[in-house]
Each structure stands twice: as C-alpha cells, then as structure tokens.
Amino acid sequence: MYGNNNPGSNNNNGGYPPYGYNKSSGGRGFGMSHSLPSGMSRYAFSPQDTEFSFPSSSSRRGYNEFPGGGGIGIGANGGSANNLGGNMCNLLPMTSNNSLSNLCGLSLGSGGSDDHMMMHDQRSSNTNLIVNYLPQDMTDRELYALFRAIGPINTCRIMRDYKTGYSFGYAFVDFTSEMDSQRAIKVLNGITVRNKRLKVSYARPGGESIKDTNLYVTNLPRTITDDQLDTIFGKYGSIVQKNILRDKLTGRPRGVAFVRYNKREEAQEAISALNNVIPEGGSQPLSVRLAQEHGKAKAAHFMSQIGVPSANAPPPPPPPPHMAFNNMVHRGRSIKSQQRFQKTHPYFDAQKFI
C-alpha cells in the first residue's frame, strides 16, 4: 500500500508509510511532519497530537529502522547504524556546557496516539527512567528525539492531564537495554532545556520493594562531591539516586545528602558500617539513618512547636454534664435559648429524648 508503486514517487521506505504519516492525526499539521519546524513547541496541540507510540520490539527489523530514522541528526539523515556515532557526537557538545536551548530541527519518526501504552508499572526499573522538571511546552517528540540519541527506546511519554493536555512536568522513558539507560542518566541528567534543569533517574517501583532504601546522611564534609559520596557509600551496594543538599546562595554543600540504594539490605549495611564513623576529610562522625525516620522526627518536632499533642498523649477529660446536654440537644444555643425552649415546650422530656 505504501510501497514505491508510483514511478514518480520518492518513497523508498520498503513498505513503511511515508515519513510523518499519522493515521490517527486526521490530517493535523503536527502529525504530518517528520521534523520539528522552528518554534513548533509554542503551538498548542491536543493530547491526541502529543501522545504517540513507536513500533514494538517485535515489529522492528533493525536498530535504526524506524520510519523517519532514529536519533538526533541535526543537518543529517538519521536511521543508519553508521550515523549513531555522529548523533552522539552532535549531542555531547551541547551537553558539555549543560545547555540545550533548542531542540528544533531534530529527525523524528512518525507518531500516533496509543492509549494502551503501559509505562513504569510493567517495566524493569533497570531500563525505565523518570525525567523530572520538564519545560511546560516540551512535546513527546522532542523528548523522544533527545533520548533516542542514546539508544533504542520502547516507550516514551510525558504525563499529562487527560482532559486538558496540561503537562505535569515529568515523563517516563523506557530503554531496551540497561546499558543505554545508565548512559542516559550519565549524559542527560542535569542538562538545561529552556531554562529548566532536567533530573533523570531510575523510575522506582511502588510498594514494599522500595521501603527502607533511602538514607538521610548528615555531618558530611562541606567540600563533599558526588564522586566522593559514591566512594563512601558505593561499597555497600548499588546506588540508584543521590542528592547533596546545597546552599541556595553560595551553591556549596551543606553537609547533608540523601542516598538511595537498590535494595533494603544494602541500605541497612551502609547504616551499620557508616553511622558514627568519621569519613576521610571530615571532622565529625556521620549520622546515617533511614529518611523515613528523619521525616517522622522532623514532623513530631514541628507539631510539638505549634502545640499539637502527640499521638501518645492521654485523651482530654469529658465535658461537664451541662455542656454535654448543650452539645447533644441544643448544640450552639445559649442558656437563655434553652430556657425559652423549655417554656414553649413544657412537655418536652430532654432526658427521655436523649
């Protein structure tokens, strides 16, 4: 149907639809183009236009055989295996200075709406990534083009309000291999896209599997770096995510960090080995505990400051009988109102009514 049956046609896609063909788009301009026009992200499109899917792993014939090519090819045609290295070379200079101000002109595959795309709940956390702090006007196609330069992707979607299409500012990107997901975190985490600094990390599954894996660490050296934090805590397990808290004005470390491990046992081992231990270059023993315990202690301290009794406090004494009567029979009435009521209702037996 889409083959090169017309002698004057330039469609050499081997049976694939023409580049940019979108059956579900109904002819809208967004679905009819395989590349992003300048300023495209400023246009308003419906959620149907911005949500799309790509061929599943079972339907692909090769690494880069998406319709319309794959990867970021600025000024070049994506889609060949030889072009992957060039695409990465095009991306790395942009990320070296933590700036990616413009994503227009990227080579993208055609897309269409797919309501059956299942994201983080069915995929391994070793390949599924969560991308936070996305620009409000960033589209799924831009996000796909950005991450497709790293490697082949199973699914890619920005989470939106299903009625209005409003972006919630985060997305899930699922790679086909663990190596590509690791490289995506290393290359794309922290880059700036339209004045927004992206945060790329593994998407964590819900439930019991992630309980007691996040550590709250204090008394770290004020010169601590990410590499030094990896050296200290990486001995005890696989670190999924880490965050050194910094002063908002100076940008220097505050001596506090969060470290999340892949398994609960790894976090417990780190607590046993590092709590009350002075690290290299430090002057105080570390305080390492579960982040949940820190949150509970902080909440209890705040509640005590504002005068809210704790959960273990004894219950207040019961009200006196006249107040109980007032609350049960004539709630909100004054004593005069009660007397007036009794005069106008001489046969009303309050005790019997109660």
Curated annotation (Swiss-Prot):
Annotated region (Disordered), positions in chain: 1-20
Q: Which SMART domains match?
A: RRM
Its main subcellular localisation, reduced to a broad class, is nucleus
Q: Which PROSITE patterns match?
A: RRM
Classification via Pfam families: RRM_1 (PF00076)
Gene3D superfamilies, per database record:
3.30.70.330
- List the protein's name: Protein sex-lethal
Q: Which organism is it from?
A: Drosophila subobscura (Fruit fly)
- Gene that encodes the chain: Sxl
